[in-house]
């Protein structure tokens, strides 16, 4: 399903999803309805650290959510109604940008402090290693992985792809969304049940998204 938020097709900036939940930073009915319908999740509507861009600000898997200590107490209360939440003090506050994870493992921005990587891995019960995707450090925007498959920036190299596939436990294909956007995490939200993409995604791109996420 294709959606835009007030004309913006970068829907991955506004939402973060797991197998059971989605956190959405804007009270935008078309996006919320699409996520509920296609991903079969309960939706939590809240900002993170005062920002609508929750896709950039938080990490999420079936174990729970990770946010920085910039999160507001009212936002934290909203999240904790449904999720276990780990709050970490770190200068690298955009966990959604800097972590690429599923329920098995993932990649962290190579500049993330090792102590933070360890805390996240322990809390989320995953194998987490530092790395890049297509040379990009903001790995959470450079690719999307679910428990079934993954779609990565077309510039990912063989070594990066092998590393990601090993830790996430899924095969990863390369592609774009939104008519050529290679930062696929900015325009795609997905779990093992379905996906929603930005409105500008072409039919050709959709075919690759389908093949990547549902092999």
Swiss-Prot record:
SUPFAM superfamilies: Pentein. One of its GO terms (biological process) is cytosolic ribosome assembly. It holds the Pfam family eIF-6. InterPro entries: eIF6. GO terms for molecular function: ribosome binding; translation initiation factor activity. Keywords: Initiation factor, Protein biosynthesis. Binds to the 50S ribosomal subunit and prevents its association with the 30S ribosomal subunit to form the 70S initiation complex. NCBIfam families: eIF-6, PRK04046.2-4. Belongs to the eIF-6 family. This is Translation initiation factor 6. It comes from Archaeoglobus fulgidus (strain ATCC 49558 / DSM 4304 / JCM 9628 / NBRC 100126 / VC-16). The lineage of its organism: Archaea, Methanobacteriati, Methanobacteriota, Archaeoglobi, Archaeoglobales. The gene is eif6.
